């Protein structure tokens, strides 16, 4: 299907058999939906969105989302099936609420120029995010790139073979619940406003030695930090004035709950928390 022209308030909905592959070619299109996704994939095997050469395409949401048949549609592009973005044109995605692009299966991007502004996640794939190439500028109220599958630890992974990434996020720059593999690419990531917004903390050093000027791991107040040695204070929660615990957003540059493998690329990271973080192993080569 070849799409061009403007739609001021409406959606393109794909609803077909689950064994059917669908291709949309965006040939200079502008679609805004005041209450749903500009493009909504309700049912299909795989959907390919191709950015035609030398075209500028715009997809946006006006700031609200209405639940349709118990489906929580919460992004400017929302797919319940595998979604692939490709082509050499450009795509601007604006989500005043919710996410920029969401796939509830695999999100694959092989090329194109993307400018994404989202109140929540910029790019989100439940089973995986796989990027071969592309030029990405993402501003996100949560994570810029986010892959998470709570049901299957083998999924929720991120694989990036190349591309140029300028990511600014209030949460993590790139986050995965599974493993993460970065083969190449140029990354400029600002997470949580940068290191100047990081919390000052003192860690207990191995052998009981603290930081400079604070023997034995003592805090400037004279108190010892809580928790096990090496554990960062206030990692996951903080206490409000009312005494109730509230979740603290993770503000790491690159974070994975699985293994992190980096074999190439150029990285410039400004993060309020860790630049690189893995809850498993980190392997760097190349």
Label the model's feature ranges:
Residues 1-286:
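A composition-driven surface/loop motif
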């Amino acid at each position: 299907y070849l799409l061009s022209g403007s739609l001021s308030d409406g959606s393109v909905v794909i609803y077909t058999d689950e064994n059917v592959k669908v291709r949309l070619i965006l040939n200079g299109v502008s679609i805004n939906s005041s209450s749903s996704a500009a493009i909504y994939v309700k049912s299909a095997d795989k959907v390919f969105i191709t950015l035609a050469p030398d075209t500028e395409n715009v997809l946006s949401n006006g700031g609200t989302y209405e639940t349709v048949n118990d489906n929580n549609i919460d992004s400017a592009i929302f797919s319940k099936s595998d979604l692939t973005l490709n082509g050499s044109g450009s795509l601007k995605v604006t989500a005043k609420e919710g996410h920029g692009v969401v796939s509830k299966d695999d999100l694959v991007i092989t090329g194109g120029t993307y400018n994404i502004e989202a109140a929540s996640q910029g790019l989100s794939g439940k089973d995986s995010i796989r990027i071969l190439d592309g030029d990405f500028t993402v501003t996100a109220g949560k994570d810029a790139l986010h892959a998470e599958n709570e049901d299957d630890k083998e999924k929720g992974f991120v694989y990036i073979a190349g591309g140029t990434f300028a990511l600014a996020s209030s949460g993590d720059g790139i986050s995965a619940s599974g493993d993460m593999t970065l083969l190449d690419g140029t990354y400029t990531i600002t997470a949580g406003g940068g290191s100047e917004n990081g919390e000052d903390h003192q860690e207990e050093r191995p052998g009981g030695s603290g930081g400079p000027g604070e023997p034995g791991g003592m805090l400037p107040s004279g108190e010892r930090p809580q928790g096990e040695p090496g554990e960062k204070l206030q990692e996951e929660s903080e206490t409000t004035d009312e005494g109730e615990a509230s979740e603290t957003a993770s503000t790491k540059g690159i974070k994975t709950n699985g293994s992190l493998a980096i074999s190439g690329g150029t990285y410039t990271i400004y993060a309020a928390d860790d630049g690189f973080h893995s809850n498993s192993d980190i392997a760097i080569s190349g």
